Amino acid sequence: MSALRALLGLGLLAAGSRLRRVPGRAGACPAGSAWWEARRPHSGGGGEPAGMASPAVKYLSQEEAQAVDEELFNEYQFSVDQLMELAGLSCATAIAKAYPPTSMSRSPPAVLVICGPGNNGGDGLVCARHLKLFGYQPTIYYPKRPNKPLFTALVTQCQKMDIPFLGEMPPEPMLIDELYELVVDAIFGFSFKGDVREPFRTILSVLDGLTVPIASIDIPSGWDVEKGNSGGIQPDLLISLTAPKKSATQFTGRYHYLGGRFVPPALEKKYQLNLPPYPDTECVYRLQ
């Protein structure tokens, strides 16, 4: 409880927010099998066994991922908020399959969702809202909020669902390990370029010291979109959106899901994505 008192003493919660102490959950995970590996049984959390993903599933470069997005918006007239809602729901669904509430040590399981300033952060806000509906207790840290109606609305939706927002990031990994059972990395997406600046440099440094598992949305934050990890965070769960990116070939965590079941068949054919068949009405597909 000393760590919790220290955290509360720092005034890390925004007004009206509450945090619960949740014992740490070991997050050191063995390297997962290759994404094209055949179906295999799986025990404990993680939902259904991994499917048989075709070896031809395409891993996109940054340029290809941007081109697909542009066509979705321009040619197919999808709106940003529409795709964000579908992506965020996919992320929450993948998390619920990898870490079912019944497999966690506390009820409801406490989850910290860290959101960046762009669309990846918006996906995280939507994900947090659905996690609340799925039986988790999310808390959001959103240090750089865009002054745009879409993101303001997403924040309001979360607040109306009694999802607390932190005023500051817990400064030590052990505090996060004590308070949460899972951290969702919704900081940077595939369009990120350049050096990581504050406050996100410090945030990623803290995340790198966690023992609780990290679930990264689309790209593990701090990774090069094509080359992969350069000594940054090591997520336990990766949720690729639309199609996997080239950096995902360097992913060694336990769970890799594909989400975002919204790609029109003609667009999939044009870019030769060769996406795997989603089962029944599922919005996610387990690649690993």
Swiss-Prot record:
Its cofactor is K(+). SUPFAM superfamilies: YjeF N-terminal domain-like (SSF64153). Undergoes physiological phosphorylation during sperm capacitation, downstream to PKA activation. It comes from the Eukaryota. One of its GO terms (cellular component) is extracellular region. It is found in: Mitochondrion; Secreted. K(+) binds at residues 120, 185, 221. Residues 1-48 form a transit peptide. The keyword Nucleus does not apply. It catalyses: (6R)-NADHX = (6S)-NADHX; (6R)-NADPHX = (6S)-NADPHX. One of its GO terms (molecular function) is nucleotide binding. InterPro entries: YjeF_N_dom, YjeF_N_dom_sf, YJEFN_prot_NAXE-like. Binds 1 potassium ion per subunit. Keywords: Isomerase, Lipid transport, Metal-binding, Mitochondrion, NAD, NADP, Nucleotide-binding, Potassium, Secreted, Transit peptide, Transport. (6S)-NADPHX binds at residues 119-123, 189-195, 218. GO terms for biological process: lipid transport; membrane raft distribution; negative regulation of angiogenesis; nicotinamide nucleotide metabolic process; regulation of cholesterol efflux; sprouting angiogenesis. Residues 65-275 form the YjeF N-terminal domain. The modification N6-succinyllysine is found at residue 144. Belongs to the NnrE/AIBP family. Catalyzes the epimerization of the S- and R-forms of NAD(P)HX, a damaged form of NAD(P)H that is a result of enzymatic or heat-dependent hydration. This is a prerequisite for the S-specific NAD(P)H-hydrate dehydratase to allow the repair of both epimers of NAD(P)HX. Accelerates cholesterol efflux from endothelial cells to high-density lipoprotein (HDL) and thereby regulates angiogenesis. This is NAD(P)H-hydrate epimerase. It comes from Canis lupus familiaris. The lineage of its organism: Eukaryota, Metazoa, Chordata, Craniata, Vertebrata. The gene is NAXE.
